[in-house]
Amino acid sequence: MDSRYNSTAGIGDLNQLSAAIPATRVEVSVSCRNLLDRDTFSKSDPICVLYVQGVGNKEWREFGRTEVIDNTLNPDFVRKFILDYFFEERENLRFDLYDVDSKSPNLSKHDFLGQVFCTLGEIVGSQGSRLEKPIVGIPGKKCGTIILTAEELNCCRDAVLMQFCANKLDKKDFFGKSDPFLVFYRSNEDGSFTICHKTEVVKNTLNPVWQAFKISVRALCNGDYDRTIKVEVYDWDRDGSHDFIGEFTTSYRELSRGQSQFNVYEVVNPKKKGKKKKYTNSGTVTLLSFLVETEVSFLDYIKGGTQINFTVAIDFTASNGNPAQPTSLHYMNPYQLNAYGMALKAVGEIVQDYDSDKMFPALGFGAKLPPDGRISHEFALNGNPQNPYCDGIEGVMEAYYRSLKSVQLYGPTNFAPVINHVARYASSVKDGSQYFVLLIVTDGVISDMAQTKESIVNASKLPMSIIIVGVGPAEFDAMVELDGDDVRVSSRGKYAERDIVQFVPFRDYIDRSGNHILSMARLAKDVLAEIPEQFLSYMRARGIKPSPAPPPYTPPTHVLQTQI
């Protein structure tokens, strides 16, 4: 089958575009201080090797090596590591350091100087995107310090405003001229193509002028200026069977020349070219304008010091079942996390990298509290309403397990109190220095729908997002309504200013093979993927610019280098 027809199968539906856009890319620089000295007559000759961990199999694979720097315990490596960055993924990294003793590329032939484990989010989320960590791995020895800095690559935050027109396109309609539109594809590493933009249809003309459109350089070519961009020209048909007119290829570098004779493209239909000797083309497409704009990115705010505050709220209603019974969604299995624990850990372990103090408020709702059995929809899991903060995700898990032993599951399922709890904090910080993420884990049918909608509409004006994970077998129709992807949430005639709710049913992520690590990585990816855009939509709407990052660390330079 002609590969062209495969690639156009989805041209009618471009709603999933955002999922296909690659992450931004960051450049990680490595410096070390006070490395171990393994050489007898001189100082060590260090090299740093980066390993990345696979999500499913947890295997470490070598990603790259710096150069060797001769005779120093304080190297500032020149060669950088360029990594794809996804906010919604936990990207585990390992930096191994060696003292190079020969030209051999085999690392076992060199002296091990120690290693550091971290996540890419940890580096990016540190103040000024600069992380210092002790080097470990040699018992009883002080191995020195590693300094890791992350810098977003400039090409990843550029967007392009482009406009095209066409001349003398083939006539495809029996009773009139064509109704042309353009479809843009970026090429992938494996030679396949991914759709990245579709223009509007211009009706009944062979010489259309399309409206200017804006697209990020990441979406257009993944930041690679020489990567092929394929453009297909179609004649629109009401029944969706659009007629192929022809195609051409270009690249970002060619387009960046702007309007010129280099940017007039012949539209060619390969089938016609193969059959007809006199065939030249099916018309031409001309670039009318090309303007590059640099956009402020999520990482600009993080680097400037914006903190993400994470709060969890857990459903303690009786519909979860008696926690002492294995059938309960709150059952404490000594060998395996329950669904609540898995959801907390999956999302929390990623978000915690962006919160400097790692102290998280943890709330519960729908339970009777000791000693008097009053019903609460906003209680502290640690039992301290004045200070509901828990130390790290592990602290949240401990408080959750402790409270299961002391409270009585009851009802009803009310969300509004915990949403309003976080909104009170968010409403006091509107300068862009903090953003709040509330994770609600629930088993069910919501009881206070009207109040919850009102809370969401009010919260949509504040620096906050809400993630809802539904556990158990219930129907979650009401949650889908709160998600607001299809219809914006409204209350009393007022619509939410922006979409701030993301809902996912936990059952969609239960891995039949029992690989919980992989299924939880997928859960975290899906619930967190929208956060950076929700964050930016708040900052843009309020006209808040990122704070300047602290001045970059500039260590003293060393000149001697050897390649390995």
Swiss-Prot record:
Chain ranges of the VWFA domain: 309-510
GO biological process: cellular response to calcium ion
Residues bound to Ca(2+) 2: 39, 99, 101, 111
Cofactor-binding details, from the entry: Binds 3 Ca(2+) ions per C2 domain.
Domain of life of the native organism: Eukaryota
Residues binding Ca(2+) 1: 39, 45, 99, 101
GO terms of molecular function: calcium-dependent phospholipid binding; metal ion binding
SMART domains noted in UniProt: C2, VWA
Single GO cellular component term: plasma membrane
Keyword Repeat: yes
Keywords of this entry: Calcium, Metal-binding, Phosphoprotein, Repeat
Domain C2: 1-133, 142-265
Residues the record lists as Phosphoserine modifications: 260
Amino-acid positions noted as binding Ca(2+) 3 in the UniProt annotation, renumbered to this chain: 101, 104, 109, 111
Essential cofactor(s): Ca(2+)
Protein residues bound to Ca(2+) 4: 173, 179, 235, 237
Residue positions binding Ca(2+) 5: 173, 235, 237, 243
Pfam families listed in its UniProt record: C2, Copine
Function as written in the Swiss-Prot or TrEMBL entry: Probable calcium-dependent phospholipid-binding protein that may play a role in calcium-mediated intracellular processes.
Family statement drawn from the similarity comment of this UniProt entry: Belongs to the copine family.
Name of the featured protein: Copine-8
GN (gene name): CPNE8
